[in-house]
Amino acid sequence: MKTKILSVVVMFLLGTMNLLAQSKTEKFKVFGNCGMCEKTIEKAALSVDGVKSADWNKETKMIEVTFSESKTNMDKVHIAIAKVGYDTEMHKAKDEVYNKLPGCCKYDRPE
C-alpha cells in the first residue's frame, strides 16, 4: 500500500516538474515610446498561442515574455510584434505598417 501511494506521489511530482519545465521566460528589445505602444506590443505578444505573459518596459524598451516551449517559440512572438508596427531585435516591421502608427508611437528606427 505504501508503495502505491509513494508511486502516485512521485508521478504527480514528475508531472508537475514537467509542466514547469515547459515554461520559459525570455527578454528582448522592442522599439516603442509610450503607454499606447506598451498596450499594443503586449497585446501582440499575448496573441501568440502559448504565450502566458508579456510585460514591456518603455524606459528600457525590453519585453519579458513567458511562454510554453511546447506551443510556441520566440520567433513567432517577434513576428507578431513586428506585424503591428514595432521593430524587434530579430524582425523589422514593414514600413507601411510602421507608418500607420500614431505619431506618439513613432520612434527612430535603427538601420
Regions found by a protein language model. Name each.
Residues 1-25:
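Bacterial Sec-dependent N-terminal signal peptides
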Residues 23-31, 98:
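Immediate flanking context of iron-sulfur cluster ligation sites
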Residues 41-43, 76-84:
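Short amphipathic alpha-helices in soluble, non-transmembrane regions
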Residues 58-66, 96-102:
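Surface-exposed aromatic
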Residues 85-97:
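Conserved short beta-strand edge segments in small beta-sheet-based binding/regulatory domains
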Residues 99-111:
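Short, low-order "capping/linker" segments at domain edges
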